[in-house]
Amino acid sequence: MNKQDPKRSNEPPVWLMFSAGGTISAICFPVLILILGILLPLGLIPMDNIIVFAHTWLGKLVILAVTIFPMWAGMHRVHHGLHDLKIHLPASGWLFYGLSTLYSIVVLFAVIAL
C-alpha cells in the first residue's frame, strides 16, 4: 500500500550538483591544467588573454562552473564516504551541503565583483 504523504528527499538536487561537478571536473580540469599549468608558464599563452576572458560574462560563467560544481561533488563524496565508513556525524548533511552552499555564495559574489 502506498503512503498518502510520502517524505520528500533532498537527494535529487544534491545528486544533480554532484553529477554536474563530476562531469565538469572530468571535462574541464585537463584543459585548465594544460592552459594554466603548462602553456601559461611556458609563455605560449599571454596572461592578458586569460584576464580579458575572465572579465567577460562567459568567462565569469566558466569560473563559476569550474569552482562551484566540483565543490558540491567533493562534499557529496566526503559525506557519503564517511557514511560508508560508518562514521556518522550529527547533521552531516547540513554540515557538508551547508558548507557547499556557503562556498557557492562566496564564489558567486567574488566572481560578480571581478
Swiss-Prot record:
Membrane topology recorded in Swiss-Prot or TrEMBL: Multi-pass membrane protein
Pfam families for the chain: Fumarate_red_D (PF02313)
Biological processes per GO annotation: fumarate metabolic process
Matches recorded under InterPro entries: Fumarate_red_D, SQR/QFR_C/D
Subcellular location: Cell inner membrane
Gene3D superfamilies, sorted: Fumarate reductase/succinate dehydrogenase, transmembrane subunit (1.20.1300.10)
Superkingdom of origin: Bacteria
One GO cellular component term noted in the UniProt record for this chain: fumarate reductase complex
GO molecular function: succinate dehydrogenase activity
Location, primary (coarse class): membrane
Transmembrane spans: 27-47, 50-70, 94-114
Keywords in alphabetical order: Cell inner membrane, Cell membrane, Membrane, Transmembrane, Transmembrane helix
Subunit record text: Part of an enzyme complex containing four subunits: a flavoprotein (FrdA), an iron-sulfur protein (FrdB), and two hydrophobic anchor proteins (FrdC and FrdD).
Entry similarity comment: Belongs to the FrdD family.
Biological function: Anchors the catalytic components of the fumarate reductase complex to the cell membrane, binds quinones.
Protein name: Fumarate reductase subunit D
